Amino acid sequence: ASFYDLKNKRVFITGGGSGIGAAITEAFLAQGSLVSFVQRSDASIFCDQMEKKYQNRPYFIQCDISDISALNKGVDEAKEKNGPIEVLVNNAANDVRHSTLEVSEQFWDNSQALNLKAYFFSCQKVLHGMIEAMSGSIINMSSISYMMGNAGYPSYVTANSGINGMTRALAREFGVYKIRVNAIAPGWVMTEKQKEMWVSPELLDAHIKRQCLKDLLLPDDIVDSVLFLASDSSKSITGQLLAVDGGVVTTG
């Protein structure tokens, strides 16, 4: 899909160098957007690949977004490079599996710092510029995990429920400034991490059978929804959660 108003749009993405985040970064680059992203691991090779493919190099800032000071500095650096942020995509997350009875206070705090706290403070950081501009779009990547009541990673599920509450609250608070805040809840997307750590033929087959649409979900299947919510095509949409899941939530 082509969204012509995204050309030269200044975009900031968390976790934009791998998995779904990399697909989102690439999609914006293909639209001609000016993309900056943060990630904890080195993404220089990915940036080289994108520059060669699109002649449009994303600006990579290496940092741990659970460190709010480092996150704020990253946003400032992106602003200095490309100008004020017009689109924020909160994407970075960690869905490591864990047991309720074994979760320590430190694990819980670390999980929430990455999966929820960083989302809030990245919103806070970019909102100042968006208020001044009287425009902006924030897209929070959530998950269908809380809608399904998934077991096996309760801290992550809790954070995703919180993301959706935060999305609605910020949409209401900042709509007066023509800032839109929405969330996307992907289904089980076959990233390299998922395939390496958690996918088995049996689990995948059972999941696909529950989807209304029987196709595997790939990172590229998520990106058009992100572009739509970033563009003026969705100018009357805010405070919403869009499930991109093949219909698995519909079947329960």
Regions found by a protein language model. Give the residues of each.
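Active-site helix of classical SDR
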Residues: C123, A159, T167
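Conserved glycine-rich Rossmann-like NAD(P)H-binding loop of the short-chain dehydrogenase/reductase
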Residues: Q31-F46
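Conserved glycine-rich cofactor-binding loop
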Residues: R10, G17-S18
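Residue(s) in the substrate-gating loop at a strand-loop-helix junction
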Residues: S143
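Alpha-helical segment proximal to the catalytic Tyr-Lys
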Residues: H128, R172-V176, K235
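Short C-terminal tail/terminal secondary-structure segment
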Residues: A1-D5, M148, V226-L227, T238-G252
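Substrate-binding pocket helix/loop in short-chain dehydrogenase/reductase
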Residues: S99-T100, S104-Q112, H207
